[in-house]
Curated annotation (Swiss-Prot):
Binding locations of Zn(2+) 2: 153, 180, 233
Record note on cofactor: Binds 2 Zn(2+) ions per subunit.
Statement: the UniProt record of this protein carries the keyword Zinc: yes
Binding site for substrate: 63-65, 95, 279, 310
PROSITE patterns per the UniProt record, alphabetical: DIHYDROOROTASE_1, DIHYDROOROTASE_2
Name this polypeptide is given: Dihydroorotase
Record-linked PANTHER family: ALLANTOINASE
A cellular-component GO term for this protein: cytoplasm
Annotated positions binding Zn(2+) 1: 61, 63, 153, 306
Pathway involvement of the protein, from the record: Pyrimidine metabolism; UMP biosynthesis via de novo pathway; (S)-dihydroorotate from bicarbonate: step 3/3
Enzyme Commission number(s) of this protein: 3.5.2.3
Keywords: Hydrolase, Metal-binding, Pyrimidine biosynthesis, Zinc
Organism in which the protein naturally occurs: Geobacter metallireducens (strain ATCC 53774 / DSM 7210 / GS-15)
Lineage: Bacteria, Pseudomonadati, Thermodesulfobacteriota, Desulfuromonadia, Geobacterales
Length: 424
């Protein structure tokens, strides 16, 4: 099927493009970019006047819960949520049941996504077998099977020697290590950020030092082994300072943050709202300011959701008992566009952090609109206003702290391999 996207503001940082152009798609690939592009007869046309056209957005950190926890989410519902949020590709974390530490699980995910998914799914394998932090997974097998990275997300590797070896082996295999940087001995029984609000609410806190200490360890190990390292969901000003300094020294470290870390503070926990409970926890206003500064100065390379669906029975509990995590695929774009309105980022820089950089970090052939590239394209309506409504979310789970928010900006069309998979 051929497709012509006409008259949109095309933003493609991979080519330094930011101008009104047409895009012709043929046989699932970008054929031509230009003004007044002529299309063959019978070509479907999208009028993108007043809209923004970008390389397909990539969320490099989601939990699809499939296999094993399909009552929370599965590949079908999760990829529908991704498409509705403007994402053409997602990278899914390995904390499934069974854990994705082998070829069989990876192959299952890829096959199901190809057969039933709405968007591209790139599996992330586990660093250690069963994510138990004891024995390294067969990283070569995982990469050959289709994994684009390895991570023990949600279960940080506490053994420093093991983490060192993981970085060394991953470097040799040419696969990225994604670190969930938290010192679990400092996290303890904490359920929110340690500070004034936790004291006021009588909830046990998690100190910023838990993230900072683990970030420092992993950055130094990456420096020692001269290995690439990606730090997931950065939330503290201290960890950002560590990463910024490491980059200045030439350490091969990249990092991401999530929209909730620049949109909310730990004040959101007041009222004991379990939809404001996640890991790492929401931090202070100073941390939010630091996250925005790090997005602006390039310390933070990518925006990823850490989409973590949970059934209502796992969230509608006392705060201490509720599970960590929130859904984010369908609110990420609109929350991130607020950074442009606030003057934190320009649109091209935002696209870089939501499409181009995730592709580079994961080493996948996406994140560009160059002729010949796969036609994964996001068309954004920056003026669309809507309310975050649980009943309208495509995700099976509704655990979002943004329910009821009046927001601006949304995906108008999501195009995967030249096929429209979502239309607003």
């Amino acid at each position: 099927m051929n497709l012509l996207i006409q008259g949109g503001r095309v933003i493609d940082p991979s080519q330094g493009i930011d101008e009104v152009l047409d895009i012709l798609v043929e046989n699932g690939a970008v054929k031509e970019l230009g003004k007044g592009v002529k299309a063959p007869s019978g070509t479907e046309t999208i009028d993108a006047s007043g809209l923004i056209v970008t390389p397909g957005l990539i969320d490099m950190h989601v939990h699809l819960r499939d296999p094993g926890h399909e009552y929370k989410e599965d590949i079908v519902s999760g990829t529908k949520a991704a498409a509705a949020g403007g994402f053409t590709s997602v990278a899914c974390m390995p904390n499934t049941k069974p854990v994705n530490d082998n070829k069989a699980v990876t192959s299952y995910i890829i096959a199901k996504a190809k057969a039933e998914g709405s968007v591209n799914v790139f599996p992330v394998g586990s660093i250690t077998q069963g994510s138990k932090g004891e024995l390294l997974s067969e990283m070569g097998e995982l990469k050959e099977s289709g994994c684009v990275a390895v991570s023990d997300d949600g279960h940080p590797v506490t053994n420093s020697e093991l983490m060192r070896r993981a970085l060394e082996y991953a470097k040799g295999m040419g696969i990225m290590v994604i670190s969930h940087a938290e010192d679990l001995s400092l996290v303890g029984a904490g359920v929110m950020n340690e500070g004034f609000v936790s004291t006021e609410l009588g909830l046990k806190g998690i100190p910023w030092a838990a993230e900072d200490a683990a970030t420092a360890r992993d950055v130094y190990l990456a420096e020692f082994t001269d290995s690439p390292l990606h730090i997931a969901h950065v939330s503290t000003k201290g960890s950002l300072r560590i990463i910024r300094n490491a980059k200045a020294r030439g350490v091969k470290v990249t990092c991401e943050t999530a929209p909730h870390y620049f949109s909310l503070t730990d004040d959101a926990v007041r009222g004991y709202d379990t939809n404001a409970k996640m890991n790492p926890p929401l931090r202070t206003a100073d941390d939010v300011t630091a996250v925005k500064e790090a997005l602006k100065d390039g310390t933070i390379d990518a925006i990823a959701t850490d989409h973590a669906p949970h059934h209502i029975d796992e969230k509608d509990l006392e705060f201490n008992e509720a599970l960590n995590g929130i859904v984010g695929l369908e609110t990420s774009l609109t929350l991130s566009l607020r950074l442009v309105e606030e003057g934190v980022l320009t649109l091209p820089v935002l696209v870089d952090k939501m499409a181009c950089n995730p592709a580079k970090i994961l080493g996948i052939d996406r994140g560009t609109l160059k002729p010949g590239s796969v036609a994964d394209i996001t068309v954004i309506d920056p003026k669309a206003t809507w309310t975050v409504d649980a009943d309208k979310l495509a995700s099976k789970s509704k655990n979002s702290p943004f329910l009821g928010w009046e927001v601006k900006g949304a995906a108008a069309f999501t195009i995967v391999g030249g096929k429209v998979v979502y239309k607003r």
